[in-house]
Amino acid sequence: MGQELTHETFVYYLLNKPQGVISATEDSRHKTVLDLLDETARHKQVFPVGRLDIDTHGLLLLTNNGDLAHAMLSPKKHVDKIYQAKVAGIMDEEDILAFEKGIKLKDHTCQPAKLEIVSVDRNASTSLVQITIAEGKFHQVKRMVAACGKEVADLQRLKMGPLSLPNDLELGDWRRLTQEELDALTIFGIPLA
């Protein structure tokens, strides 16, 4: 009586991407997110769903399900991404309103976004903020903060859609999605198995 083997069509990994690693499948100069996975995971030909800048850390989903990736990245879906930023400068009510209206950048006006001030250190002239955006333009969070006259010193992605960065997932570590996390992804209406 042999055990029945199941073949997985799609796999899903949650990575806590460290700084200094790029969100690509291959690169000749930098370590990539695939370099952090084991051979079994790499063999599944996964790719990152979206990108985090080389100096941004935090939640990154890797999968080989192109339909899900497309749905999660589609501008029509308005998938929220939540970042925590340490900012050089004091973010204030004026900045919150600017984010709500949509920050004007050189190449486009951002969709309205949410800026929440978590804490302010007036002595060090720094702020800790959470920023929620539905877009994913090049260096968008950093550029939005810069448009307010401040600078992002550290940027971490905490959430993407229904997925949250687990507190117990160390930088550079990864794991398969839990059944609960997979169930949460069904909101995109894409077959996951």
PLM region descriptions:
Residues 1-193:
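Basic, flexible Lys/Arg- and Gly-enriched helix-loop patches that mediate nucleic-acid binding at interfaces
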